[in-house]
């Protein structure tokens, strides 16, 4: 069996929910707060560590009630969320090889998908130890192939290997990790899924209701 390198996950929960009208992460989804779906998707031994990063006291309370590590902050930018989350994971797992950034508002994202993404980056093939550090700068994002369309749908979660950690810790104010997509296009890879709804986020009450209906069909 090949050794799996350590991968962590930052659950992004610092958004303002402006389009939703209230904190969407706490909205009911199949009988529990929507954020609990992200807890379930990341509840896997394939992840060496995980942490929720939020500006919401209520979200922090929910995390603590479910024994999910949480970091509460009051900083404004997406770059702050990335830096705080990655820094916290590196304190827990200094040898971290990859870091996944997962939004808390994609309730149909499933655990198998998270495990697949973590596994693709974290495989320690024998040759990997002999490769140059440049090959530890890969980026993996989730995607769905659209029939008769050469351009796939792409989205989150996104996983960055450790060669990019320093740049993630020093992103421009207000910017997220997507700036590295443009900087290193040859290093961006897509992990394809069969269900496009895993990419869907619940930005409005109407979108939440549609996704909940889809989830109930699978029960």
Residue ranges: model-predicted function:
Residues 48-84:
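Short, surface-exposed acidic-centric catalytic microdomains
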Residues 29, 71-73, 142, 191, ...:
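Hydrophobic residues at beta-strand termini and immediately following loops
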